[in-house]
From Swiss-Prot:
Protein name: Long chronological lifespan protein 2
Family: Belongs to the LCL2 family.
Source taxon at top rank: Eukaryota
Biased composition (Low complexity): 35-45
Described function: Probable component of the endoplasmic reticulum-associated degradation (ERAD) pathway.
Length: 132
């Protein structure tokens, strides 16, 4: 009987450090995200930050901005910039995209993708000539 008591006491003593070490692992693996959410809520509340809801998945915000934009020339649909011609539209993310003008006044924005300056435009030109 004494041996059984010692075994149970040993198991209970070891259970606490195991739960502390692997508790979050088991929570994440089996869907118990309560502890993580509580921590995030405490962090947001503790620093005076409020958690904002995600942007809705409908286009109403964009459409409202588009309708409010005043432009007597051409209003670029992706940046809402007012320009003289469609191919003058800027890229939405100029630090990360190169602009390439295509035939018939069209333009595209291509990810720079870590290439050196002008490399994306060079590849587009090669593709246009059928060399890529």
């Amino acid at each position: 009987m004494r041996t059984l008591y010692l075994v149970l006491l040993s198991l209970l003593t070891l259970a606490s450090p195991i739960a502390a070490q692997f508790g979050s692992f088991f929570d994440q693996m089996f869907g118990g995200h309560g502890h993580q959410q509580t921590q995030q809520q405490q962090q947001h509340q503790g620093h005076g930050h409020q958690q904002h809801p995600n942007v809705p998945s409908d286009p109403s915000i964009y459409q409202a901005n588009y309708q409010r934009a005043h432009c007597d020339k051409y209003l670029c649909p992706d940046t809402l910039a007012c320009v003289h011609y469609p191919h003058h539209c800027p890229c939405p993310w100029p630090l990360h995209e190169d602009k390439a003008e295509l035939a018939e006044g069209q333009r595209i924005c291509v990810s720079k993708g870590g290439f050196k300056a002008g490399e994306a435009a060079r590849k587009i030109e090669l593709a246009r000539k059928g060399m890529l």
